[in-house]
Amino acid sequence: TLIGHSYGGRVIIKLAARESIPFEITNIILIDSAGVLPVRTTAQKWKIRKYKILKKFLNMKLIYAMFPEVIDDWRSRQGSADYRNATPMMRQCMVKAVNEDLTELLPKIRQEVLLIWGDQDTATPIRDAHIMEEKIPNCGLAVIPGTGHFSFLEKPAQFRGIMEAYLK
């Protein structure tokens, strides 16, 4: 059994969709998994575009030399904590991974899959779980009400109950 949360789910999807791997995967549990591209509103797309333009402008050496504290403060508030703490190379990897859509791989997964999701997840919304459930051939979805992206931490007893029932 392979179990993956968030980005770990993305890794498992890519692995399980391969034609052959050097070991057997009997079943998979994906928890609030990444892998489906987010649907962005026009306002969100515009915000991203403005961010990219501003970032290029603020990266100019002359501009930075004039306002280093302001620019450093602005940069310190951009992205997730993981992104802010990553090296520049790792940031590039994170951006590439987040923008990679794995939905075309989902029908290729041959193993039995259980999805466990928090209905209040904003990082990987419940909409993503429904897409995965629809596209993965042998798949079921368990939703933990009132939880977000870390459903297993927010309601551990309910999460454990789902896992125990599935793994019996």
Question: For the regions a protein language model found, what residue spans apply to each?
Answer:
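Short beta-strand immediately N-terminal to the catalytic nucleophile in serine-hydrolase-like folds
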Residues: L2-G4, I31
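Conserved alpha/beta-hydrolase "nucleophile elbow" surrounding the catalytic nucleophile
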Residues: G4-G9, G118
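Flexible "cap/lid" loop of the alpha/beta hydrolase fold
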Residues: R10-R18, F23-N59
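Conserved alpha/beta-hydrolase catalytic His-Asp/Glu region
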Residues: L30, P38-T42, K56-Q111
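Short beta-strand/loop motif that positions the catalytic acidic residue
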Residues: K108-I109, L115-W117, D121
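Conserved alpha/beta-hydrolase "acid-adjacent" motif
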Residues: T122-D128
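Catalytic histidine neighborhood in serine/cysteine hydrolases
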Residues: E133-F150
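Catalytic histidine-centered segment of alpha/beta-hydrolase-like enzymes
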Residues: T147-R160
